[in-house]
Amino acid sequence: ENVALTIGSQSAFFFLFNMLGGEHEDGTHQKILLPITPEYIGYSDVGLTTNLFYSYQPVIEKLDNHFFKYHIDFDKLTVRENTAAMCVSRPTNPTGNVLTDEEMLKLLAIAEQHDIPLIIDNAYGEPFPGIIFTETKPFWNNNTIFCMSLSKIGMPGTRTGIVIANDLIINSIRNMNAVINLATANFGPM
């Protein structure tokens, strides 16, 4: 009920962003909020409409030995009236920054408060063991959409995306899959 497979996580984001954001029948233009930048550049290619995203710059914490960590600037983060969903990658691509559990809990609370989904791109992260080296706790509730990818865990030929979400989102993805790609790829000889 809560899992759908796609032909890679990129197609999952194509489905999700265009299903939730963009032009709607009532004439509104819904947007996807990226709470922190830099963020995965590949998101910019999946929208069927222009101006699909808006985002915020991070707060930068300087660490020892010329290292730094950046965090979501919750003081500036605003969910607009036309926000359809929030999306973060954990860890972020391209920098590998891992949002803290505290940041994730705040994002979940904001998503629930505004009754919008929080899309979490876990292509490089939880729940697969040994992929990231920061202690994290996976989260899920009815407002959460997890996207994962088998290609990022050492199986690049599989092109299989995994979406975990509420049954309404999953049924919509299954319906889109039936039209666009009918079935995910099989492993075949490897």
Describe the predicted segments one by one.
Residues E1-H114, I119-W140, I145:
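Conserved core of the PLP fold type I
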Residues T28, L48, W140-M190:
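Conserved core segment of the aminotransferase class I/II
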